[in-house]
UniProtKB/Swiss-Prot annotation:
Region described as Disordered: spans on this chain: 69-166
Protein name: Sec-independent protein translocase protein TatB
The keyword Transmembrane helix is assigned to this record: yes
Coiled-coil stretches: none
Compartments it resides in: Cell inner membrane
HAMAP family per the UniProt record, alphabetical: TatB (MF_00237)
InterPro entries from the UniProt entry: TatA/B/E (IPR003369), TatB (IPR018448)
Record's keyword terms, sorted: Cell inner membrane, Cell membrane, Membrane, Protein transport, Translocation, Transmembrane, Transmembrane helix, Transport
Gene Ontology biological process terms in this record: protein transport by the Tat complex
């Protein structure tokens, strides 16, 4: 990385940094600079790996087109291998995105009887809870919350409550 910089130049940069930043801030500055350099190296390596992967895919596509133009009968072993790799890559890409429909997988009952929706029939709460367990929750009214003793209700007499008088 420092191909053109010798020891004397690095020593000069260190002394200038010590004079400009001081002994308290110099170690912090060196640590932050090295972390930035590491982050840039990681980013450059990831970009390089992605480009290599894309180039490999492009090479596989070129080999496949070459194989198609020659015909699939007289192929070299390299081309056969690259075709197999391309097929495996295509299968691995398509496999995670396949969604299995549970409705299609399970057979539908042929003689299923659907219950009609009856909104006009009056039932007792016991019958409703047997027919639909969620109906009792929906039909029961919410309990009224009583006012807490620390919070007087509107218009309540607060003379006997010392907390309410403040």
């Amino acid at each position: 990385m420092f191909d053109g910089i010798g020891f004397m130049e690095l020593l000069l940069i260190g002394v200038l940094g010590l004079v400009v930043l001081g002994p308290e801030r110099l170690p912090v500055a060196v640590r932050s600079i090295t972390s930035w350099i590491r982050a840039m190296k990681r980013m450059a390596n990831s970009v390089k790996e992605e480009l290599e992967q894309e180039l490999k895919i492009e090479q596989l596509h070129a080999d496949l087109k070459k194989a198609e133009s020659k015909g699939l009968s007289n192929l070299s072993p390299e081309l056969k291998e690259s075709i197999e790799q391309l097929k495996q890559a295509a299968q691995s890409v398509n496999r995670p995105y396949q969604v299995q429909d549970p409705v299609k997988d399970t057979p539908a009952p042929e003689n299923q009887i659907y219950s009609p929706v009856a909104s006009t029939v009056q039932t007792s709460p016991a019958q409703a809870s047997q027919a639909n367990p969620t109906a009792t929750v929906e039909a029961s009214p919410a309990p009224a919350s009583p006012a807490t003793p620390s919070e007087p209700s509107q218009g309540a007499d607060t003379r006997s409550n010392p907390k309410a008088n403040g």
